[in-house]
């Protein structure tokens, strides 16, 4: 593994660059997935995703292509995200669903806040969502020793009887995974006794260090649950009655609409305003836009295959399912950059337009939108120019937010990604070309985040929700990297994010006052070490110790 920074790059860096160039071509980015297994492999295996690294942008790109990121480990860590928590978020977002957490009752402690949240997010989309309905099998010491499959059977039947849900998502947590409970056999046994499809989710926290593996777990469970994605033949459509004198006209109208229809795949981190902004841009090109799968009903999923193209708004979230639809139904898909900021939005819309032969129309639209945005950002740019920002969260959001920060004249002091793989190389190559060789960590550890911020001394942070409190305790004001309450996507989102940065920098008293009255739980000796002191490569050496 290469540990030198750009200033001391070894001679074999050229070879690594050639590997990177080959790996980032779309033709090379093919997933080798077996959709017939009980559960999917973790992303450390399928995508060589790394969860621990310290260095700079060029090091991360090179080592991602070489597969070295997956070899890094920590000799010390605090808590980290659990893939079960991520899996339940998607389950809650499916209209009229029920989630069953098979495990001790404490595994559901983080889910109470989702009740109001899911209803609100649904209403923002014009949909009446039920409460976040979930059961726990509440395994006791006795069941942990003797098995809890009977409790799971009872919970499934009770959930189906009480709610008649659209789907029942069954989460396999750590304890039953360790003792060997067979949820697949239980679900197979009960399929004929329930009205709801039963979706197995093998998501114990210890199973994957890359918590985004949970997205693959959910989509794998959905495709195994028996939902119908088969295209509906014309003859089965009532409007397409062969005896109808307008039969041929209606079929042609349908075929034309389908040829201009795209499916966009959302996430809980993508708000209704984000969806509206992207819909506005794509419908201006004459395209028909639909959103799946979150905040939709499983009955609607049958129409997924009635489209010309699938598009991931965040491929970290949806690539697994899009690959399944491609292999099973020959549906093409593209993976454009998440549309935050002018550069990423132009790339997102242009790539979709190219598929439909609409590049010229897209260029005219985007030129006009960018001119309006540039004028709106001018006064903001004058006030925030030169201010230092650190950005942390999922790598697609982090990278595009960094390009937006540069667009308004800010200096990106550092980036901190929860994980990283080669699917980010095209974006991060643009970051290196535009922003320079920025210090970049791969970390989900609060201790490393605090150390990094102490050394970089940013004026402001853009943080994954829930982590801004660490910034504010350090005296650094923070705004959210994403939120359902605001717009982030497209040109409207670029302006709103820039405006929030401007307003936050104008008054930093809250974070300053908080830092004067809060003592963080870390020793001064920790701040004297590199933030990546505990991240080692397979030879036992610290990775990227001179990055900051």
Enumerate the language-model features and the residues they cover.
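An N-terminal assembly and electron-transfer interface module characteristic of large anaerobic redox
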Residues: 2-548
């Amino acid at each position: 593994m290469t540990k030198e920074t750009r200033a001391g790059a070894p001679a074999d860096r050229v070879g690594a660059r050639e590997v990177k160039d080959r790996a980032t071509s779309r033709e090379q980015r093919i997933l080798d997935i077996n959709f017939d297994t009980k559960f999917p492999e973790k992303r450390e295996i399928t995508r060589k995703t790394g969860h621990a690294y310290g260095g700079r942008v060029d090091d991360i790109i090179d080592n991602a292509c070489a597969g070295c990121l997956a070899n890094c480990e920590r000799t010390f860590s605090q808590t980290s995200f659990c893939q079960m928590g991520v899996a339940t978020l998607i389950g809650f977002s499916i209209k009229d669903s029920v989630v069953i957490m098979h495990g001790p009752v404490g595994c559901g402690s983080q889910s109470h806040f989702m009740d109001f949240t899911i209803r609100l997010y649904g209403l923002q989309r014009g949909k009446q969502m039920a409460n976040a309905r979930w059961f726990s099998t509440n395994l006791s010491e006795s069941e942990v020793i003797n098995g809890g499959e009977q409790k799971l059977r009872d919970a499934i039947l009770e959930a189906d009887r009480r709610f008649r849900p659209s789907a029942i998502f069954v989460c396999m947590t750590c304890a039953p995974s360790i003792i060997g409970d067979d949820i697949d056999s239980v679900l197979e046994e009960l399929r004929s006794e329930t009205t709801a499809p039963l979706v197995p989710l093998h998501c114990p926290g210890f199973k994957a260090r890359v918590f985004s593996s949970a997205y693959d777990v959910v989509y794998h469970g959905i495709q195994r649950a028996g939902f119908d994605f088969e295209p509906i033949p014309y003859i089965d459509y009532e409007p397409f009655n062969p005896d109808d004198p307008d039969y041929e006209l209606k079929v042609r109208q349908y075929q034309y609409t389908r040829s201009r229809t795209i499916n966009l795949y959302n996430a809980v981190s993508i708000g209704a305003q984000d969806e509206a902004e992207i819909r506005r841009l794509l419908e201006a090109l004459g395209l028909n836009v639909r959103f799946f799968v979150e905040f939709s009903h499983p009955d609607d999923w049958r129409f997924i295959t009635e489209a010309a193209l699938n598009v991931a708004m965040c491929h970290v979230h949806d690539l697994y399912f899009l690959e399944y639809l491609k292999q099973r139904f020959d549906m093409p898909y593209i993976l454009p950059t998440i549309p935050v900021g002018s550069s990423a939005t132009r790339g997102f819309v242009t790539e979709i337009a190219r598929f439909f032969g609409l590049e010229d129309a897209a260029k005219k639209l985007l030129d006009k939108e960018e001119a309006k945005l540039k004028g709106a950002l001018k006064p903001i740019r004058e006030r925030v120019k030169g201010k230092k920002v650190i950005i942390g969260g999922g790598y697609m959001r982090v990278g595009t937010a960094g390009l937006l920060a540069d667009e308004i004249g800010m200096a990106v002091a550092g980036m901190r990604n929860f994980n990283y793989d080669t699917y980010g190389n095209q974006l991060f190559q643009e970051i290196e070309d535009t922003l320079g060789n920025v210090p970049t960590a791969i970390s989900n550890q609060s201790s490393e985040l605090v150390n990094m911020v102490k050394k970089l001394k940013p004026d402001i942070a853009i943080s994954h929700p829930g982590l801004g409190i660490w910034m504010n305790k350090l005296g650094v004001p923070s705004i959210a990297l994403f939120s359902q309450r605001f717009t982030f996507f497209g040109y409207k989102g670029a302006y709103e994010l820039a405006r929030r940065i401007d307003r936050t920098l104008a008054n930093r008293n809250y974070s300053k006052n908080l830092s004067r009255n809060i003592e963080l739980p870390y020793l001064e000796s920790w701040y004297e070490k590199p933030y990546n002191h505990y991240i080692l490569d397979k030879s036992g050496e610290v990775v990227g110790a001179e990055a900051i």
